Structure formats: structure tokens, C-alpha cells
Amino acid sequence: MQRKLNQSLLLAEAYFKRKFTMPEVNYELRGIKAGVAYLQKNEIKFNRTLLQENTDEFIRQVVPHELAHLIVYQMFGRVKPHGKEWQLVMNEIFKLPADTCHQFDIKNVQGKTFEYRCACQTHFLTIRRHNKIMKENIEYLCKKCRGKLVFVDDEE
């Protein structure tokens, strides 16, 4: 992990011809995200469980992905999170695909989900979204068919 951070930082320093401060790193991120970059703090939080379950791919892709966010912020300020500046760092400097989402199995980090259906498929919503629907009458729509998601109540 530290070696990949160092290697990636050196590549960025050579490309931009300037020094970057090594970010603070912790492994306390929970949920389904693999990593999060905190731009103003120069800090990266990684998901320990996803790292342990997907070590090689995590180090190869997620570590530089999050570091790229910090480098972009320090070079260009506030820009789109996965915009052209970030893609430049990923593609040109790190020589990696500019993937915005990981493909890791999330069953061990996901938490309880609730089954919903629309006209075209089944969806599994987090407890947070389920509670918003139940308590606040929020509606969620399917991205494919634009149909309303309807709770499948197992107890009926």
C-alpha cells in the first residue's frame, strides 16, 4: 500500500515538476466505498474489508484513484471529481484506466438491504433509502425504465 502511494506520488511529481505531500492514510472507511479522498485534509480513507478481500486489484487501482483526486485538487483546485484533469492523472501519469467505480464483491460490507421492484428489474436498497421511503414518503425511480420502486414486503 505505502509502496504504491510512493510510486504514484513520484510519477505525479515527475510529471508536474513539483513536490506533493504524502497524504494521511487510514483504514476506517465503512460501507461499500473502497476509498475516499478528503481534499482539504490531504487524507485518504480506505475500506479495510475491501482491501483485505481484493488486495492486488485494490492496491493497483483504488490507491492511485484516490491519490489522483488529491493531486488534481492541489494542481487545479475544485474541479469535477472524475473530470478531464482526474482522467489525465489516471491515464497519462499513472497509465491506468479512469474507472470511477470498483467492481468488488460488496456482500461483506453492504449491510442489510430491502428488496424493491420496478417494471423491469429487482433493486436492493440500503436501510437508509428504505427508511426515507417509509418515513418521509421519498420516491426512488429506476434508472433504466424510470418506473417507481415499490417495496416487496416479505410479510404479506
UniProtKB/Swiss-Prot annotation:
Entry keyword annotation includes Electron transport: no
Q: Which domain of life is it from?
A: Bacteria
Query: Where does the chain bind Zn(2+)?
Result: H65, H69
Give the cofactor note text: Binds 1 zinc ion.
Subcellular location per UniProt equals: Cytoplasm
One GO MF term, please? Answer: zinc ion binding
Q: Which residues form the SprT-like domain?
A: 11-152
* Entry cofactors: Zn(2+)
Give the chief site where it resides: cytoplasm
- List, alphabetically, the GO terms of the cellular component aspect: cytoplasm
User: Is Zinc given among the entry's keywords?
Assistant: yes
The record's keywords, sorted A to Z, are: Cytoplasm, Metal-binding, Zinc
What processes in GO biological process is this protein linked to? response to stress
Active-site residues are: E66
Question: Which family does this protein fall into?
Answer: Belongs to the SprT family.
Cross-referenced HAMAP family: SprT
Q: What is this protein called?
A: Protein SprT
Organism of origin is Haemophilus influenzae (strain ATCC 51907 / DSM 11121 / KW20 / Rd)
Lineage summary: Bacteria, Pseudomonadati, Pseudomonadota, Gammaproteobacteria, Pasteurellales
